[in-house]
């Protein structure tokens, strides 16, 4: 079978496998690629190739992640799988692999385990919107009642962490048997196709960045004589058109102005959209009224804040992080989008210190207001060196 070029006409969705160690995440990933490859929908990626995923650096943090892709009738999927538990935590906190839906793999003979809980909680915290469950290794359990119990326990656990436990699809099967089956019509492969159908049906098409309200972090400010002030940056989401109202948010009181021009590579455009590096000309704005670190946004779409809750991963010494723990009252810089702001970290009750390599839930109080929202990623830095990564889980004020 020759390589089929993936058609980009289908909606694109990002998914990933999560769950406890040895419950079968990587086996399932390999089985999906094998069975879909037989239908010309993927390239088979064997287990050991996924397991020996190369390390990537994301914001200075080393994460081992395997990427595979496949398609169904409805969609094109990019799927991530991480070899180690720590890689998952880093992945979810840095948003290196943003997931529109997660496939939670749970071994039926084990039931939910500590990492199962942690991955569900993290999915909720970092904003993974949908979970589909693959109940693996059902061939290892003789008693159907035990399988039902595990299923009940899982639904309760999902509900406890804010997912709709009663509605979450639970597909039962054996990833190993599906991986070993060479005939795509073999009954052992049925679970793979059921899983794909469940993801197709249950995880909605994500809202594309271009359809969200406009936001561009300011990287640079210029004044062009006779024309006014231009702010440049990469459009994070949405579309900006000439003569639309915008707000400048962060550091100082928010103010409104009008976009009087959009330029890209010195050419004038009618609009700039998500992913474009553009210059936006602002009406009647002085050069000293705007600065790097503020954002240009659709009015009312984002507000400045100083206090929030976050999930944070602290880099290990080997990752270039701190060599020593930090304590309550720690004051590093928090790097949001294009700038550093000093803030104070409050540690959770009963936590006296945080060691390199830990992940914690924390509260942060910034000394100046910044345009913030839930699920925004940030780096924690000391003197320009990244020592941690975080994601906002809740805005306080």
Curated annotation (Swiss-Prot):
Keyword flag Magnesium: yes
Annotated region (G1), positions in chain: 19-26
Region described as G2: spans on this chain: 60-64
Binding positions (GTP): 19-26, 81-85, 136-139
Cytoplasm listed as a keyword: yes
Single GO cellular component term: cytosol
Ranges where the record places region G4: 136-139
Domain tr-type G, chain residue ranges per copy: 10-207
Alphabetized Gene3D superfamilies for the sequence: P-loop containing nucleotide triphosphate hydrolases, Translation factors
UniProt-annotated stretches for the region G3: 81-84
Subcellular location: Cytoplasm
Binding-site residues, Mg(2+): 26
Catalyzed reactions per annotation: GTP + H2O = GDP + phosphate + H(+)
Region (G5): 174-176
Entry superkingdom: Bacteria
Enzyme class: hydrolase
Known function: GTP hydrolase that promotes the GTP-dependent binding of aminoacyl-tRNA to the A-site of ribosomes during protein biosynthesis.
Protein name per its UniProtKB record: Elongation factor Tu
Organism listed in the record: Syntrophobacter fumaroxidans (strain DSM 10017 / MPOB)
């Amino acid at each position: 079978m020759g390589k089929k070029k993936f058609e980009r006409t289908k909606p694109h969705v990002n998914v990933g496998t999560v769950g406890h160690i040895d419950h079968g995440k990587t086996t399932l990933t390999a089985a999906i690629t094998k069975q879909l490859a037989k239908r010309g929908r993927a390239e088979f990626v064997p287990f050991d190739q996924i397991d020996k995923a190369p390390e990537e650096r994301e914001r200075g943090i080393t994460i081992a992640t395997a990427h595979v892709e496949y398609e169904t009738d409805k969609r094109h999927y990019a799927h991530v799988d991480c070899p180690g538990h720590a890689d998952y935590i880093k992945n979810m906190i840095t948003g290196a692999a943003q997931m529109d839906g997660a496939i939670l793999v749970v071994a039926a003979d084990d039931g939910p385990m500590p990492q199962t809980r942690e991955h569900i909680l993290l999915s909720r915290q970092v904003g993974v919107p949908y979970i589909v469950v693959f109940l693996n290794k059902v061939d290892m359990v003789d008693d159907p009642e035990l399988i039902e119990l595990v299923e009940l326990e899982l639904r309760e656990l999902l509900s406890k962490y804010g997912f709709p436990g009663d509605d979450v699809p639970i597909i039962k099967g054996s990833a190993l048997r599906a991986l070993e089956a060479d005939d795509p019509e073999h009954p052992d492969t049925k679970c793979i196709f059921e899983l794909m159908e469940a993801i197709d049906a249950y995880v909605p098409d994500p809202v594309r960045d271009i359809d969200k309200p406009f936001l561009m972090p300011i990287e640079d400010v210029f004044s062009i004589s006779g024309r006014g002030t231009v702010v440049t940056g990469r459009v994070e989401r949405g579309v900006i058109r000439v003569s639309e109202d915008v707000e400048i948010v962060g550091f100082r009181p928010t103010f409104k102005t009008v976009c009087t021009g959009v330029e890209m590579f010195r050419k004038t455009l009618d609009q700039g959209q998500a992913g474009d590096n553009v210059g936006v000309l602002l009406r009647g704005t002085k050069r000293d009224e705007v600065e790097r670190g503020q954002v240009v946004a659709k009015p009312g779409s984002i507000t400045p804040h100083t206090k929030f809750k976050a999930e944070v991963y602290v880099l290990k010494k080997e990752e270039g992080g701190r060599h020593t723990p930090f304590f309550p009252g720690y004051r590093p810089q928090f790097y949001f989008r294009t700038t550093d702001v000093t803030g104070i970290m409050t540690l959770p009750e009963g936590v006296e210190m945080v060691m390199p390599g830990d992940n914690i839930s924390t509260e942060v109080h910034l000394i100046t207001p910044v345009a913030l929202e839930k699920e925004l990623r940030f780096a924690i830095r000391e003197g320009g060196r990244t020592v941690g990564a975080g994601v906002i889980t809740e805005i306080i004020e």
